[in-house]
Regions:
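Beta-sheet repeat architectures centered on beta-propellers
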Residues: 1-341
Length: 341
């Protein structure tokens, strides 16, 4: 495939596949070949047979037929230099049959013969809540605003939704169905609830949800596993990490953009995992009619562990945004006064 000024291909000769990129291709001389998957040597499985890319979005997605997981490579070029690149993976509800990218949308066909799409750029029709001239995107799958007719019962304190004709068309849902109040004039904009299915086309929600603009869809999990932290220094155009030093992490600081509800998990050697759930807004800091989201926020997470003894994971299974922009850490560093030769 062509990435613009370079060409990329899959090398399937080993136990795991490799994603190579060729540059400086000319009639005379050999091109420069770089193994872009060297930083994730076990990420790409063998026998990859589905490959698609979007040069406009600097994105390559690859996968295997009858597999429910695809791997992605995102890159950023400025001029003739590669400034940044990253690997990620997506897991679908059903195995994949075919996929392609067109008009800034990633389309994939699963084993249910259901053609679905993921938008690579923001569209005007994407579900969101606008507050104080700031737009907060809602992160749900298979979303819609057509929930049929609803009625509230004061005796049962339940709102019943009927005539939800699309509900039985969603096959093999792996996550929870949620309903979100997206009416900015509502007294409780941003609230969400998990309904109870009463039939194939109806469900109930606790509380009064009648007469407001609602968005309904399925939750999905967002997870970021951070690598081991080392003190690094820039030497020329490269950064060198001091892996022989002693570093005790005291705390990390998560620099968020638009943020709602999220959680962190510390996986420590010899200790039980520690999970903490955070809400971005603080008490007595916002009105009851405001959505509980912030435009930007810096959260300090205490660690107090040696850098090689802890793995840190950021997760969010909430419809609110969780935009991580940067991360910094503080700790006790010692070079151990080794003499290097």
């Amino acid at each position: 495939i062509s990435l613009g000024t370079t060409v990329a291909y899959i090398d399937d000769s080993g136990k795991f596949s490799r994603f190579n990129e060729m540059a400086n291709i000319a009639r005379e001389g050999e091109p420069n070949v770089v193994n872009q998957s060297q930083v994730v040597p076990t990420l790409l499985p063998k026998d990859i047979d589905l490959l698609t890319n979007s040069r406009e979005n600097n994105l390559v997605i690859m996968g295997r037929t009858n597999s429910d997981t695809v791997q992605g490579f995102r890159y950023l070029n400025v001029g003739d230099k590669r400034q940044q690149s990253a690997w990620f993976k997506w897991k679908f509800n059903n195995p994949l049959l075919y996929h392609f990218i067109i008009n800034d949308e990633y389309y994939f066909l699963d084993t249910d013969n259901f053609l679905q799409s993921i938008r690579l750029v923001q569209q005007e029709s994407d579900p969101s809540i606008t507050q104080d001239n700031v737009e907060f995107l809602l992160h749900i799958d298979n979303y819609t605003t057509d929930t049929g007719s609803s009625s509230y019962s004061a005796s049962t304190k339940l709102t019943t939704f009927t005539g939800v004709s699309w509900l039985p068309l969603v096959t093999s849902p792996n996550y929870d169905l949620v309903v979100i109040d997206t009416n900015t004039a509502s007294a409780r904009v941003g609230r969400y609830g998990k309904p109870t299915l009463t039939s194939s086309t109806s469900f109930t929600l606790p509380g009064d949800w009648s007469g407001v603009t609602l968005t309904i869809g399925y939750l999905y999990e967002y997870s970021v596993a951070f690598p081991t932290f080392y003190l690094s220094r820039q030497q020329g155009e490269a950064n060198r990490a001091d892996v022989n030093s002693s570093l005790v992490l005291h705390r990390i600081k998560l620099h968020f953009g638009k943020i709602g509800l999220y959680e962190t998990t510390l996986t420590r050697i010899g200790k039980t995992d520690y999970t903490e759930v955070y809400e971005s807004t603080e008490l007595d800091e916002y009105q009851v009619s405001d959505a509980p989201y912030l435009e930007e926020f810096i959260k300090t997470v205490p660690v107090y562990e040696k850098n090689t003894n802890v793995d840190i994971t950021l997760k969010s299974s909430h419809p609110a945004p969780s935009t991580l922009r940067a991360l910094s850490w503080e700790g006790d560093y010692s070079p151990k006064y080794y003499k290097r030769v």
